[in-house]
């Protein structure tokens, strides 16, 4: 047993230059843990509350001093004295202390920072890597990376409607080789864009952010890059999209406006037709948030039409929330959940969502946020839970590469017992 003797939070910066919460946990044994909380740009309306100060004189109102103070003045006194290995008990105590259904009193960013730092301190105490401490002896599966190499929507200042266009190197024999394949395609894409006279600046998640004629054109240039790198689209490398359609859903009309393509007033059925057409023309294996988070009828139609052969990931749809996920499972909506620790606010609840998804035959994709830091906790979570997939950005920006590098270390440490399933991690669809 190692008792927590101090908890301390401070305001630091994320990859977009916005403040976020860093938490440190100290124990009587000398074990120590530190964690930094990520932040999203396109957020689901049902997410746990990220507490911002709203003081326009500091960081344009995005300061997090209130969340920091909540850790130092409210949460710390509550959990000092806990055994650092009592993760569930500590998380439960913070949830009860907050007392709201969405962590709106203390802030999910305050609670999550403590939850993650506690896990790091506990792993330090028992002398295990974080993934082994959280996942036990069976934690050995390296995730298939979903690499966002073209950014659009809320993640870039361009005219592309869809938020992310990803490559998935499912044909690699190991995680290390999947990273090499992804990096080679990324560099090939830069050359393709340059040769077309297009911008090669990168967006929030490290992908390129060119102005393109359509969302279809984004897929076309990625196919060209895959082939230029010497790989075969639909064999070695598949495509994925995070549409983030809530960002271009018009609540007043109940329609979808693809402004970048000059197509407005699209119905849910027309959006589903569009996705089905794209999936016939391109080797798309995963679509995230294809319809608005509250358009459950649209999601149901999409699942009925292509859910047997395409992974349909719920991000804003499920917000890492077991109640929302249970509703989706009951109604047969989507077949996968995106796991973002700050959408729900504790590691305990995060693990519960992954477990529920797997029991129902849904896949789980551990994910970063667009506002990231050097913290690589999600890499360990992906291996600890054998989630099978991770979405943590492109092959540039240290805030993204930090997660890939941590996974490379874990694979090296696991040695011969490391597993990389590639295409088999999409176990609930037919390819």
UniProtKB/Swiss-Prot annotation:
GO molecular function: magnesium ion binding; phosphopyruvate hydratase activity
SUPFAM superfamilies tied to this protein: Enolase C-terminal domain-like, Enolase N-terminal domain-like
Location(s) in or outside the cell: Cytoplasm; Secreted; Cell surface
Reactions catalysed: (2R)-2-phosphoglycerate = phosphoenolpyruvate + H2O
InterPro entries: Enolase (IPR000941), Enolase-like_C_sf (IPR036849), Enolase-like_N (IPR029017), Enolase_C (IPR020810), Enolase_CS (IPR020809), Enolase_N (IPR020811)
Top enzyme category: lyase
Predominant location: cytoplasm
Cofactor mode of binding and number, as noted: Binds a second Mg(2+) ion via substrate during catalysis.
Sequence positions that bind Mg(2+): 242, 288, 315
Cofactor: Mg(2+)
Record: active site: 205 (proton donor), 340 (proton acceptor)
Function comment: Catalyzes the reversible conversion of 2-phosphoglycerate (2-PG) into phosphoenolpyruvate (PEP). It is essential for the degradation of carbohydrates via glycolysis.
Family statement: Belongs to the enolase family.
HAMAP family to which the protein is assigned, alphabetical: Enolase
Name of the protein this chain belongs to: Enolase
Native source species: Bacillus mycoides (strain KBAB4)
